[in-house]
């Protein structure tokens, strides 16, 4: 059951991922589809009006010039409230600025050090595998994700999936595919370690095959192939992350290879692809282990995916940014009795601290409880009339 506002203000949980107030939505007012997507997203996710950024520019192309982007970026920076940590971009085209992806240009500003010349390494992201939950505050960067799709119906379905995934603790599988495509299979060397690191967290299958079909439990699907067949036979759970390591997947609307949009159309909630030939550096693509670890901590899709790419300059992130399938859930099950669901990628301890005043001091209320890998159910008593305030923390 939902609990009273009084109980919500008296029981505090750790912040595990972005909230609606942390996201600014960027709309192109000259693009009717962008307006429709942005307005629906604001309404569906309860994004504050102050976080809505409305621009005007021509959308009839895939690539924006550096000069044009820098002018837009000045406006975006001016209109972005200081507290905002990330951007949701309400269009599909343009998806690229010069040699950079639009999402990385928004995060870092346009700078050619984030692009590869002659297959050289590019500038790294300080956000890679970072514990930070406030990238704008800690690193002066705001990760971005595109609410991408070829029709309003598609993007609406994507947004609705993201919302449906929140606190849902899906019991899905992680599929890590080692394919016959040598140039695109370089993530496979890390799969065994990933399986070890995430044992007991997600059911994980490492398969030596080019594709899977007829599975209805897909939560993660990481592969390396120019075209991924049989997507229409799969059932993706709300919140699913999926991508195919290939050089042109991020060319959303005009790729000669499979566009990353096909993952979203098939039912994934977020995906990733590169917008220019990146050379086959694994650092330019998501690390499955890092993405799954941060997702399991309760991070949002945009945080987990962004943290999984070491060199994201040429890569575009698409999907529903705020999807949080593993964020903790607190429920009142009876008067004075609560149930907390916590998902964790590691073992730890839960501390319940109590104070008669909201300002503290908080003292240990009961013996710390063990948190195991995966899903944990914790029950506790709390009388909001007499017990003051509780602070729940785990590591």
Model feature map: region roles:
Residues 326-395:
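Low-complexity, Ser/Thr/Pro-rich intrinsically disordered linker/stalk segments at domain junctions
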Residues 8-341, 345-349, 357-359:
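Cysteine-dependent hydrolase recognition
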């Amino acid at each position: 059951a939902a609990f009273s506002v009084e109980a919500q203000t008296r029981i505090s949980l750790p912040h595990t991922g972005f909230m609606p107030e942390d996201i600014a939505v960027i709309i192109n007012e000259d693009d009717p589809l962008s307006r429709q997507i942005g307005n629906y997203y604001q309404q569906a996710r309860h994004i504050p009006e102050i976080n809505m950024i409305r621009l005007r520019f021509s959308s009839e192309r895939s690539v924006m010039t550096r000069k044009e982007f820098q002018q837009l970026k000045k406006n975006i920076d001016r209109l972005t409230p200081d507290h905002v940590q990330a951007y949701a971009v309400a269009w599909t085209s343009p998806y690229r600025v010069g040699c950079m992806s639009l999402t990385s240009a928004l995060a870092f500003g346009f700078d050619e050090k984030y692009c590869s010349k002659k297959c050289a390494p590019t500038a790294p992201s300080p956000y890679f595998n970072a514990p930070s939950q406030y990238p704008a505050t800690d690193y002066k960067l705001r990760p971005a994700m595109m609410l991408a799709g070829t029709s309003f119906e598609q993007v609406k379905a994507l947004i609705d999936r993201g919302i449906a995934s929140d606190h849902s603790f899906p019991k899905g599988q992680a599929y890590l595919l080692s394919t016959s495509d040598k140039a695109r299979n370089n993530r496979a060397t890390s799969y065994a370690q990933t399986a070890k690191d995430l044992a007991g967290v997600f059911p994980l299958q490492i398969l030596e095959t080019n594709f899977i079909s007829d599975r209805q439990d897909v939560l993660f699907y990481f592969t390396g192939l120019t075209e991924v067949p049989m997507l229409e036979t799969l059932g993706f759970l709300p919140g699913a992350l999926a991508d195919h390591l290939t050089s042109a997947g991020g060319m959303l609307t005009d790729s000669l290879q499979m566009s990353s949009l096909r993952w979203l159309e098939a039912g994934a909630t977020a995906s990733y692809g590169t917008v220019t030939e990146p050379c086959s550096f694994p650092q330019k693509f998501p690390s499955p282990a890092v993405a799954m670890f941060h997702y399991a901590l309760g991070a949002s899709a945009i945080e987990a995916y962004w943290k999984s790419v070491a060199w994201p300059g040429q890569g575009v992130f698409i999907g529903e940014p705020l999807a949080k399938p593993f964020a903790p859930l607190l429920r009142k099950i009876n008067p004075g009795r609560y149930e907390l669901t916590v998902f964790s990628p590691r073992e730890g301890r839960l501390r319940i601290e109590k104070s008669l005043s909201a300002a503290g001091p908080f003292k240990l209320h009961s013996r710390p409880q063990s948190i195991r890998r995966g899903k944990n159910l914790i029950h506790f008593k709390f009388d909001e009339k007499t017990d003051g305030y509780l602070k729940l923390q785990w590591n």
